[in-house]
C-alpha cells in the first residue's frame, strides 16, 4: 500500500511524531508515478528536481508555522499555468509553452505549503469526457485499464485514485471534475462560479469554467478548497464572499436537513446500477435524520443543447488567440499571414476542438445568433430559476453524477453525441453556477459510481456536511483499485 492511503490529518500527525518527513512524501509520489504511470498515463510534465529541493527545505520549517496541507504533494491539471513548468492544455498548439507566471491557485498552493509534483493530462483544452482527446496520450482508469477515467480532468482523478498523489486540481466546465471523480471513485468538488479565481486557467468557456479539488476523502477536499478559494483582484469574476472554515462543517450531523431529489435525475437514460446506488444513499441519509422529497427541475431537458451552444460559442472566441504568432506551435512552409493562421490552427488543434470552434462560430453568426445563442441563454436563465426555486425549500439536491460507470476506451470516440450525453447530469449545475460534489457511492461490475450533492450558491459547507456524513456511514471511500496491492 502507500502513504497516500492516509488523510492529510494522519500524514501531518506522522510528520509531527517524527515517523515521516516531507522529503519522504515527495519521494513516495515520484516512486509511485515511476511504478504506476506507465499504466495510468496521468502525468504530462514532472517537477521532480524543484519539488525534491523544495521538500528538503520545508522539512526545516518549525511545526508552529505549518498549516494542515503543508508539505503535501499535489498534481495540477495542465490547463492551469505554472511558471517554468510546461503547460500545454494537452494540445499540439501549445507544445513547449513555458508560462512566465503562476495561476492564482498555484500561488495559493505555495502559500499553503503544498508541493506541485507535476502537470496532469486532460482532454485537449478541456473539451471531452474521456481523456481520449489529448494530443499526447490517453489516461487509463486505475480500476480497469481498459476503461476511460472520464474527462476532461481524467488524469486529475486517475492520479488520486491510483495513489500517485493524494491531491489534485482540476477544472469543471460541464462536469469535468465531477464525472472523472465518479468514474475513478474519488471525491471531486465543483465550487460555486466565482468561488475560486480563474486567473491563470486557460479559458475554454469563461462563464462556466471553475477550478476545484480532487481528493480521496471529503475532509481533505474541504481543506484544499479552503486553501484555493477567495477573492482575487486579477479575476473580475471572482466573488467577494467570505471563505468559511469548511472543515468545521464536517460534524456528521444531518438531522433535519432537507434533501430534494429531482425526478429528471433518476429517469430515462440513467442506468439501473446508478439509480439503485443513489436510492441506497438516500436511505443512509434518511437513517441519519435527513428528510427526502421528490421535486422537479423541468428545464433540465434543455441543458445539454444550451450548454454545447454556449460553451462552444465562448470557446470559438477564447481559442482565437492561438494563431502561431507569439507562442506555441507554428506551421511551417507557409507563404503569407493568412495561410499561417489557417495551417497553424488546422494542424495544431485536434478534431474535437475544431468541431466545437465551428459549432460556436456558427451559433454566433448573424443569421443564427437569435435562433441558437440567444435561445440558449434564455434556457440557461430558466434552468437557473429552477434551482433558485428548489433551494427556497431545500438545503441540497441529490442525484447520480453520471448515468453509467466508465465506458471502454474507444467505445464512444467516433460518436460525439453519445460522448456529450455522458455529462447530462453535471452540465445543469455549471449553467446555474451552483456548487456540486461527487463522492463514491457504489460499484457496477467493479467500476465506481458517484453520488452528486448540489448546494446553494456559496454554500459548499453544507455540501461537505452531507458528503462527510454519508462517507462516515459507509465504506466506499476506503476501497481502492487492485493496482494499489503490492505497489
Swiss-Prot record:
Its EC number is 6.3.5.7. Keywords: ATP-binding, Ligase, Nucleotide-binding, Protein biosynthesis. GO terms for biological process: translation. It holds the Pfam family Amidase. It comes from the Bacteria. One of its GO terms (molecular function) is glutaminyl-tRNA synthase (glutamine-hydrolyzing) activity. InterPro entries: Amidase, Amidase_dom, AS_sf, GatA. Signal peptide: none annotated. GO terms for cellular component: glutamyl-tRNA(Gln) amidotransferase complex. The active site is at residues 77, 152, 176. It catalyses: L-glutamyl-tRNA(Gln) + L-glutamine + ATP + H2O = L-glutaminyl-tRNA(Gln) + L-glutamate + ADP + phosphate + H(+). It is an enzyme of class 6 (ligase). Allows the formation of correctly charged Gln-tRNA(Gln) through the transamidation of misacylated Glu-tRNA(Gln) in organisms which lack glutaminyl-tRNA synthetase. The reaction takes place in the presence of glutamine and ATP through an activated gamma-phospho-Glu-tRNA(Gln). PANTHER family: GLUTAMYL-TRNA(GLN) AMIDOTRANSFERASE SUBUNIT A, TRANSAMIDASE. Belongs to the amidase family. GatA subfamily. Heterotrimer of A, B and C subunits. This is Glutamyl-tRNA(Gln) amidotransferase subunit A. It comes from Lysinibacillus sphaericus (strain C3-41).
Amino acid at each position: 500500500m502507500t502513504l497516500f492511503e492516509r488523510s492529510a490529518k494522519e500524514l501531518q500527525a506522522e510528520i509531527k511524531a517524527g515517523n515521516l518527513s516531507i522529503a519522504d512524501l515527495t519521494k513516495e509520489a515520484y516512486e509511485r508515478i515511476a511504478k504506476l504511470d506507465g499504466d495510468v498515463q496521468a502525468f504530462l510534465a514532472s517537477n521532480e528536481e524543484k519539488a525534491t529541493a523544495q521538500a528538503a527545505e520545508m522539512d526545516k520549517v518549525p511545526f508552529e508555522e505549518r498549516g494542515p496541507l503543508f508539505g503535501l504533494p499535489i498534481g495540477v491539471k495542465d490547463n492551469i499555468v505554472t511558471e517554468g513548468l510546461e503547460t500545454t492544455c494537452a494540445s499540439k498548439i501549445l507544445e513547449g509553452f513555458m508560462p512566465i507566471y503562476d495561476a492564482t491557485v498555484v500561488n495559493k498552493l505555495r502559500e499553503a505549503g503544498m508541493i506541485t509534483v507535476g502537470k496532469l493530462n486532460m482532454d485537449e483544452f478541456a473539451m471531452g469526457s474521456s481523456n481520449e482527446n489529448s494530443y499526447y496520450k490517453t489516461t487509463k482508469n486505475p480500476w480497469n485499464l481498459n476503461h476511460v477515467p472520464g474527462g476532461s480532468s481524467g488524469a486529475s482523478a486517475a492520479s488520486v485514485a491510483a495513489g500517485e498523489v493524494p491531491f489534485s486540481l482540476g477544472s469543471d466546465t460541464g462536469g469535468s471534475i465531477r464525472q472523472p471523480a465518479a468514474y475513478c471513485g474519488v471525491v471531486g468538488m465543483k465550487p460555486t462560479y466565482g468561488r475560486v479565481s480563474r486567473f491563470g486557467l486557460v479559458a475554454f468557456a469563461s462563464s462556466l469554467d471553475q477550478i476545484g479539488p480532487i481528493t480521496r476523502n471529503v475532509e481533505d477536499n474541504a481543506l484544499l478548497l479552503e486553501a484555493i478559494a477567495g477573492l482575487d483582484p486579477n479575476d473580475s469574476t471572482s466573488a467577494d464572499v467570505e471563505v468559511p472554515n469548511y472543515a468545521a462543517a464536517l460534524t456528521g450531523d444531518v438531522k433535519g436537513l432537507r434533501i430534494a431529489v429531482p425526478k429528471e435525475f433518476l429517469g430515462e437514460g440513467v442506468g439501473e446500477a446508478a439509480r439503485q446506488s443513489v436510492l441506497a444513499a438516500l436511505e443512509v441519509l434518511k437513517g441519519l435524520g435527513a428528510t427526502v422529497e421528490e421535486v422537479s427541475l423541468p428545464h433540465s431537458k434543455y441543458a445539454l443543447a444550451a450548454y454545447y451552444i454556449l460553451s462552444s460559442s465562448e470557446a470559438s472566441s477564447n481559442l482565437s488567440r492561438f494563431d502561431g504568432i507569439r507562442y506555441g506551435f507554428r506551421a511551417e512552409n507557409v507563404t503569407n499571414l493568412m495561410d499561417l493562421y489557417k495551417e497553424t490552427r488546422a494542424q495544431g488543434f485536434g478534431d474535437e476542438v475544431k468541431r466545437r470552434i465551428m459549432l460556436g462560430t456558427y451559433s454566433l453568426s448573424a443569421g443564427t445568433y437569435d435562433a441558437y445563442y440567444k435561445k440558449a441563454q434564455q434556457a440557461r436563465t430558466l434552468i437557473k430559476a429552477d434551482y433558485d426555486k428548489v433551494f427556497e425549500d431545500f438545503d441540497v439536491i441529490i442525484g447520480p453524477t453520471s448515468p453509467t460507470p466508465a465506458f471502454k476506451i474507444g467505445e464512444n470516440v467516433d460518436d460525439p453525441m453519445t460522448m456529450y450525453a455522458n455529462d447530462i447530469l453535471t452540465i445543469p449545475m455549471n449553467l446555474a453556477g451552483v456548487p456540486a460534489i461527487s463522492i463514491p457511492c457504489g460499484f457496477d461490475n467493479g467500476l465506481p459510481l458517484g453520488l452528486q450533492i448540489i448546494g446553494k450558491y456559496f454554500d459548499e459547507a453544507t455540501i461537505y456536511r452531507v458528503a462527510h456524513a454519508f462517507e462516515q456511514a459507509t465504506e466506499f471511500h476506503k476501497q481502492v483499485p487492485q493496482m494499489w496491492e503490492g505497489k
